[in-house]
Amino acid sequence: MIKLHEVPPEPVDPASLPHDVNAHSPEGDGNPDKRKKIFGIPYPFSRSSCRRFLWNCQKISVLPMALYFPLHAANTLITPAVSPDSAPDDVLMMVREILPSITTKLLVAGITLHVSAGVLLRIVNNWNKPRRNRHRHLKISAEQDLSQDSIGLTGGISGYLFGLYKTFRIPPQVISGYILVPVLIYHLLIMKWVPNSISTEVDFASIKQLLSSKNRWWKWLGGLVPLAILLESGVYHIGSGLCRYFGVRKMTSRKKWSTAINLLTLVGFVSLIRLMKEDSTKLGPNQFESIFKKIRLLLHVN
């Protein structure tokens, strides 16, 4: 007959307990070495610590662009919409006097760190992560994750207008970053790197000549199309990124951010159109002739 005996409530040493690896745990959990392994090699960092480190790298990397963007946006997006004649060049000269000579290098370093940390962060977040359920593309907001990772800034036009928030497999901010990188490299190539290599500077007179060029390849593929893509993706990526950086979570506030982003984008397109319609026949030789000639030489294109 089994009898129960009262024992004093003393702590039990776990080392004195029997270890049965296969009784209640998956194979390998009984190993005293609890370090995680990748390809069989133990590593000391957890996924959360990697995320935290990469997120901090992204936060630090935006500082040069966050300081530069207001000046550049006022010069390139707003001023030409108000007065496309000489005002943009006047503001450009003033901005160049304010900024240090290493501005471009700081921006390139910050962008490189930002992109690298972002790609690695995506890899860490998606490591062994189950795929999202793709059913029920539009959901009622009360049942849905309304974070920017899930629905973007406002969940698309339907979310902005009607509260039917669209979920995205890849966040719109990430997509805009993927689009932004190649056009930004092209922008730096024709506006900074190649002009510096031939000892010239690009101003708004050059931009007007490019956008009103009789050469359709220069005008559209070399000028208007990449500038429009840069404008749309850049303003959205920076605006939604700042919204996330400042911890804006309320949907009403995010809709206000979205409205501001759309208005700034619209003003930017007005600036492009006004610059394109400017008379560039009295502006002298087109500097982009030498710039594109240099690019053709670099690409070995006749």
UniProtKB/Swiss-Prot annotation:
<dbReference type="GO" id="GO:0007005">
    <property type="term" value="P:mitochondrion organization"/>
</dbReference>
<feature type="topological domain" description="Cytoplasmic">
    <location>
        <begin position="1"/>
        <end position="61"/>
    </location>
</feature>
<feature type="short sequence motif" description="PxP">
    <location>
        <begin position="4"/>
        <end position="12"/>
    </location>
</feature>
<feature type="transmembrane region" description="Helical; Name=3">
    <location>
        <begin position="174"/>
        <end position="194"/>
    </location>
</feature>
<keyword id="KW-1000">Mitochondrion outer membrane</keyword>
<dbReference type="GO" id="GO:0070585">
    <property type="term" value="P:protein localization to mitochondrion"/>
</dbReference>
<comment type="function">
    <text>Recruits the lipid transfer protein Vps13 to mitochondria thereby promoting vacuole-mitochondria contacts. Involved in mitochondrial lipid homeostasis.</text>
</comment>
<dbReference type="Pfam" id="PF07950">
    <property type="entry name" value="MCP1_TM"/>
</dbReference>
<feature type="transmembrane region" description="Helical; Name=1">
    <location>
        <begin position="62"/>
        <end position="82"/>
    </location>
</feature>
<comment type="subunit">
    <text>Interacts (via PxP motif) with VPS13 (via SHR-BD domain).</text>
</comment>
<dbReference type="GO" id="GO:0030674">
    <property type="term" value="F:protein-macromolecule adaptor activity"/>
</dbReference>
<keyword id="KW-0496">Mitochondrion</keyword>
<dbReference type="InterPro" id="IPR012472">
    <property type="entry name" value="MCP1_TM"/>
</dbReference>
<feature type="transmembrane region" description="Helical; Name=4">
    <location>
        <begin position="220"/>
        <end position="240"/>
    </location>
</feature>
<protein>
    <recommendedName>
        <fullName>Mitochondrial adapter protein MCP1</fullName>
    </recommendedName>
</protein>
<dbReference type="GO" id="GO:0005739">
    <property type="term" value="C:mitochondrion"/>
</dbReference>
<dbReference type="GO" id="GO:0005741">
    <property type="term" value="C:mitochondrial outer membrane"/>
</dbReference>
<feature type="topological domain" description="Cytoplasmic">
    <location>
        <begin position="241"/>
        <end position="258"/>
    </location>
</feature>
<feature type="topological domain" description="Mitochondrial intermembrane">
    <location>
        <begin position="83"/>
        <end position="100"/>
    </location>
</feature>
<feature type="transmembrane region" description="Helical; Name=2">
    <location>
        <begin position="101"/>
        <end position="121"/>
    </location>
</feature>
<feature type="topological domain" description="Mitochondrial intermembrane">
    <location>
        <begin position="277"/>
        <end position="302"/>
    </location>
</feature>
<feature type="topological domain" description="Mitochondrial intermembrane">
    <location>
        <begin position="195"/>
        <end position="219"/>
    </location>
</feature>
<dbReference type="InterPro" id="IPR039960">
    <property type="entry name" value="MCP1"/>
</dbReference>
<keyword id="KW-0812">Transmembrane</keyword>
<keyword id="KW-1133">Transmembrane helix</keyword>
<feature type="transmembrane region" description="Helical; Name=5">
    <location>
        <begin position="259"/>
        <end position="276"/>
    </location>
</feature>
<dbReference type="InterPro" id="IPR034804">
    <property type="entry name" value="SQR/QFR_C/D"/>
</dbReference>
<keyword id="KW-0472">Membrane</keyword>
<feature type="region of interest" description="Disordered">
    <location>
        <begin position="1"/>
        <end position="35"/>
    </location>
</feature>
<dbReference type="GO" id="GO:0031966">
    <property type="term" value="C:mitochondrial membrane"/>
</dbReference>
<dbReference type="GO" id="GO:0055088">
    <property type="term" value="P:lipid homeostasis"/>
</dbReference>
<feature type="topological domain" description="Cytoplasmic">
    <location>
        <begin position="122"/>
        <end position="173"/>
    </location>
</feature>
